[in-house]
Amino acid sequence: MSRKRTENGSESGPATSHVPVDRFGFLKQEHANSPERFSKSKTTSSTDHDREERKVRKWRKMIGVGGSDWKHYVRRKPNVVRRRIRKGIPDCLRGLVWQLISGSRDLLLMNPGVYEQLVIYETSASELDIIRDISRTFPSHVFFQKRHGPGQRSLYNVLKAYSVYDRDVGYVQGMGFIAGLLLLYMSEEDAFWLLVALLKGAVHAPMEGLYHAGLPLVQQYLFQLESLVKELIPKLGEHFTQEMINPSMYASQWFITVFSYSFPFPLALRIWDVFLSEVKLPFEKLIHALKTFPEDAMNPDTLLPLAYSIKVSKRLEELTLEYQKTNAKPVQP
Amino acid sequence: MAGYRADEEYDYLFKLVLIGDSGVGKSNLLSRFTKNEFNLESKSTIGVEFATKTTKVEGKVVKAQIWDTAGQERYRAITSAYYRGAVGALLIYDVTRHATFENAARWLRELRGHTDPNIVVMLIGNKCDLRHLVAVKTEEAKAFAERESLYFMETSALDATNVENAFTEVLTQIHKIVSKRSVDGGGESADLPGKGETINVKEDGSVLKRMGCCSN
């Protein structure tokens, strides 16, 4: 199910044969999203390799065959699972684990044949809009680069299926980056159900408010971020106010695409690991990144551990309520 | 904002917005003007982006702060906030897609609902390099522009046709309004526009005068 990815760019990519790509499949000459600057292990030593192997073995044991032991393990040792996820899910198991922790695997099993039906038989009012954005989604990734290639076709199918599945939301620019990220780790049908789990809420609160008319959830997150910056980094908050920088200028695209649009790819992946399991957006990380910017702010191994030390959960809940109170139309629960 | 210098020297700061349907080439027009770059494989714009370019207009140093907005209808909730304080706008359509031209009227209404009546607006037919695919006749667009008192140009971000001209023309027209205002002796403040403030090109704050070098 999971696609083979190239290691360190030395082997050939799936779509084009002699283009140098990084270990995630992005073209090397592209600087946007390129993890080069941020990945520590440029030359993987044998001890690193051993450590990685051990980590994968532990994870396999925890998951069981095809995910059979997962639920049991999570129930018995939630803290171990949480700690391991925070350290980063091994890349080779990421797709499967994401499906397990988001609850999308269950949705898939409960709805056999539904995805195929949506793709093949239904038509969507958003088809032209989707097509217009297909070649503009991760254009520097080998999988999505080829016009009408398998990557672009899968992306189209998932987005079209979703726009039919939820006609209120339809298609909104930005969803493509989420679907694209998922498609690098799982099949079309799996990616579709993960998108459903995320937006409709399988094990956690639905996030479809990101894409509803008026973008209510985006507005709420922007409000929360602005409040947190003012409270936790007052000097920066003051500076932003003076220069009339409001968070919609720099953070709209972070929220609309759940960090998949412009963050360095390895960081986006680590954020997704935690985001899917802990069911909340990484406001701690944003605050921390804004605090330490620019040194090291985008290196996942530096940013994430430090970010966990910043406690914002309680304040976030209060701000959610505050936002909903001051806005006539509350965010859909 | 690393390396930002508050004392960067310019006479005026003009805020412009780029609006128009998704995929008409707003981001590429912006990168062609500010960086002389064009990218055939660019990402869709999500939310807003901005870039600046400092240029000379009628002997004055003008810094253009240009906001590039996502074109999809659903984004209006976020992007319309960026109209506030704009003194110029480029309303862009794609000459190969007639629907994007038909939507220009709606974009214009939307823009006028959020900005000062004196805002300088230029209608732009982009992608004019695709001659064999043209679906919007120059005459048709020109007539619309005249009816709505807009400036008009056809451009190609790909081969750079008229891109510099279009932006320069808009900046020049804004400067004309501003300097006329100066001669008239209208009072102006040197502040950036505040939140929620209505910007008037005649007595605005967003048309920034710097260093007092041209106030009289």
From Swiss-Prot, chain B:
Q: Which GO terms describe its molecular function?
A: GTP binding; GTPase activity
The question of whether Cell membrane is a record keyword is answered with yes
**Consequence of changing residue 126 to I:** Decreases GTP-binding
Q: Which SUPFAM superfamilies match?
A: P-loop containing nucleoside triphosphate hydrolases
- Please list the residues that bind GTP: 20-27, 68-72, 126-129, 156-157
The induction annotation reads:
By auxin.
Write out the entry's keywords from A to Z.
Cell membrane, GTP-binding, Lipoprotein, Membrane, Nucleotide-binding, Prenylation, Protein transport, Transport
Residues bearing a lipid moiety (S-geranylgeranyl cysteine): 213-214
PROSITE patterns in the record, alphabetically?
Answer: RAB (PS51419)
Give the residue interval(s) assigned to the motif Effector region: 42-50
Describe what happens without this gene.
Slight increase of primary root elongation and lateral root branching and hypersensitivity of root growth in response to exogenous auxin.
Q: Which InterPro entries match?
A: P-loop_NTPase (IPR027417), Rab_GTPases_membrane_traffic (IPR050209), Small_GTP-bd (IPR005225), Small_GTPase (IPR001806)
Keyword Zinc found: no
Regarding the membrane, this protein is recorded as:
Lipid-anchor
Name one process (GO BP) from the record.
Answer: cell wall biogenesis
Compartments, record wording: Cell membrane
Cite a GO CC annotation. plasma membrane
A Pfam family it matches:
Ras
Role this protein plays: Involved in auxin-mediated response. May be involved in vesicle trafficking of components involved in polar auxin transport. Binds GTP and GDP and possesses intrinsic GTPase activity.
Which PANTHER family does UniProt cross-reference here? DRAB11-RELATED
Question: Other remarks on record?
Answer: Plants overexpressing RABA1A show reduced growth of roots and shoots and smaller leaf sizes.
**Assigned protein family:** Belongs to the small GTPase superfamily. Rab family.
Can you say what this protein is called?
Answer: Ras-related protein RABA1a
The organism's taxonomic lineage, starting at the top: Eukaryota, Viridiplantae, Streptophyta, Embryophyta, Tracheophyta
Its gene is: RABA1A
